[in-house]
């Protein structure tokens, strides 16, 4: 019988808001008991986007539960519902919801589980060229 196993329903984990943008997220790392990765969800309302960022040492997988758009090094990609994207550490990424009236949720997994920035791992935000 498997003992190193966990199951979490998204609706059972409290949803919080990012202080900067107000996007909603759920931290799943602790409820799942993950030790080798971080797991979060981000839910975007129409017109919302995450802050463009990169990770110094963390590879990520993004799973688009409802589809959406992903900017990778300033190039926009349409990701279908259920699409899975791998992002290397140095790639600048941002997810966005371009729909008019639908929410979009992404599951985001990062490994290794480095850093302590509000439990989201080490990340860098590109400098504004303005």
Protein language model annotation of sequence segments:
Residues 1-36, 46, 120-130:
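A short, N-terminal "cap"/entry segment at the start of jelly-roll beta-barrel domains
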Residues 19, 96-130:
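Double-stranded beta-helix
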Residues 57, 75, 91, 113:
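A generic "binding-loop/recognition-motif" signal
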Residues 74-90:
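Short acidic-glycine-tyrosine-enriched beta hairpin
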């Amino acid at each position: 019988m498997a003992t190193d196993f966990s199951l979490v329903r998204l609706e059972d984990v409290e949803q919080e808001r990012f202080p900067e943008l107000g996007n909603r997220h759920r931290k799943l790392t602790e409820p799942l008991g993950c030790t080798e990765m971080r797991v979060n969800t981000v839910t975007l309302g129409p017109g919302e986007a995450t802050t463009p960022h990169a990770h110094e040492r963390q590879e990520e997988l993004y799973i688009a539960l409802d589809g959406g758009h992903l900017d990778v090094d300033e190039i926009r990609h349409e990701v279908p519902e259920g699409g899975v994207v791998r992002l290397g550490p140095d790639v600048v990424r941002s997810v966005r919801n371009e729909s008019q009236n639908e929410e979009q949720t992404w599951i985001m997994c990062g490994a290794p589980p480095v850093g302590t920035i509000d439990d989201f791992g080490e990340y860098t935000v590109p400098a504004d060229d303005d």
